[in-house]
Amino acid sequence: MADISTTQVWQDLTDHYSNFQATTLRELFKEENRAEKYTFSAAGLHVDLSKNLLDDATLTKLLALTEESGLRERIDAMFAGEHLNNTEDRAVLHTALRLPAEADLSVDGQDVAADVHEVLGRMRDFATALRSGNWLGHTGHTIKKIVNIGIGGSDLGPAMATKALRAYATAGISAEFVSNVDPADLVSVLEDLDAESTLFVIASKTFTTQETLSNARAARAWLVEKLGEEAVAKHFVAVSTNAEKVAEFGIDTDNMFGFWDWVGGRYSVDSAVGLSLMAVIGPRDFMRFLGGFHAMDEHFRTTKFEENVPILMALLGVWYSDFYGAETHAVLPYSEDLSRFAAYLQQLTMESNGKSVHRDGSPVSTGTGEIYWGEPGTNGQHAFFQLIHQGTRLVPADFIGFARPKQDLPAGERTMHDLLMSNFFAQTKVLAFGKNAEEIAAEGVAPELVNHKVMPGNRPTTTILAEELTPSILGALIALYEHIVMVQGVIWDINSFDQWGVELGKQQANDLAPAVSGEEDVDSGDSSTDSLIKWYRANR
């Protein structure tokens, strides 16, 4: 397709922005039914877009981008298993991971739905054996602790989801997650473990990932020291497709759970990569987790674009980043259980859309890749909200909250959850409408302080509410952002499903390792790196 920025549709949007940019949310909310008009439902989520900087004309022009970019055709192609990942010639089928068993989908001659449910069945049997006590460690003890060793998509997804759904961990099994090659990560976990009741899940598609295999070998050595070599088979399982490497490590390939090339790591939490999560929350709730994904998939696939929540949120992201010049996007869950959600979204969004060339390799001329960040409320209010409220940078924000907590405590006449949500609603209100100098002066504030206390408002927010943080709702939330990524990638005409930017650093690390460890002379090819390595070697 043509570069979207060269099209008449983009020019029309540019002209519209010139006329619209001074419009305020105070003005927009003079429309009586605005909140109702811009509130939508999707897969159990209640999504209010009304506090965003848009009106009907803006939305019409943004929706024109979807037609210009061929979004409908690309959505259909993705769900059909066409090879949208053109640089690796692969299908993009994370949506198949949550298809019902009776679904009919074949790709490249393979019955995808049958393959997915065969692996799910094996995962279910294994998780059930762990939770029931039928799977025993080498010395006959039941498993109480799972240590998931992976990195990137093999860590961020299951780690986030396991914490988010900790209220569903009812079988006495808990999980720890180790990813960093910094030895402090693994050491801090191992020092509190009982080897006899610990199971390690090594998650690496190729079983060659440097960080993961370094940690896995160290964990293996620790276990062998405690229980002996023969214990490995009962205390290690693998999520991988490399049976030869898994067997070399000492893991029985009957305890290897695979996935497919059409699943990118950052889209894999609902594949075998979620084995640790399934073991902790149980197969029934894991299937509900998948059900939430599928419900959002169906909303995305079948709902008309003007009511399609992932599409509307994606278009708003393009509007803010390419027209308002917003550089970042805050995700603010008012839920401590979602404390790792923003970190998870960083990989999902930034590894996907952090690209500078089109699908055909030509340079892009628009911005791409929103920078995602965030922390749970109310912690963020006492840290960075100052900048969002009164700073010079526009930071669109998604607020995520729930009507019912899993646990609550009294707080005087109210409950702590009610206080949490009072803050939630207050923040979106103040960000939207603020308080101007005239209103502040009318309160008797000293004139020299008025400008310091002005709250400009006009900071856009999206509110996402659900009744409760359940497995299904978490699946729907994740799928929502997966589809936002896809839509933006189509509009920018980039490949959201490769990640070549991470490869060169890996290669260079392997090349430099002998010099860093002192096995070879330092000769990196540049004087700065040489000097730094020499300092490191002299001071370690």
From Swiss-Prot:
Pathway: Carbohydrate biosynthesis; gluconeogenesis; Carbohydrate degradation; glycolysis; D-glyceraldehyde 3-phosphate and glycerone phosphate from D-glucose: step 2/4
Main location: cytoplasm
CDD domains the record matches: SIS_PGI_1, SIS_PGI_2
Catalytic activity field: alpha-D-glucose 6-phosphate = beta-D-fructose 6-phosphate
SUPFAM superfamilies, alphabetized: SIS domain
Active site residues of this protein: E351 (proton donor), H382, K506
GO biological process, one term: gluconeogenesis
Pfam short name (any one): PGI
Enzyme Commission identifier(s): 5.3.1.9
Subcellular location: Cytoplasm
Coiled coil segments of this chain: none
Family (UniProt): Belongs to the GPI family.
Function, in words: Catalyzes the reversible isomerization of glucose-6-phosphate to fructose-6-phosphate.
HAMAP family attached to this UniProt entry: G6P_isomerase
Name of the protein in question: Glucose-6-phosphate isomerase
UniProt source species: Corynebacterium glutamicum (strain ATCC 13032 / DSM 20300 / JCM 1318 / BCRC 11384 / CCUG 27702 / LMG 3730 / NBRC 12168 / NCIMB 10025 / NRRL B-2784 / 534)
Gene: pgi
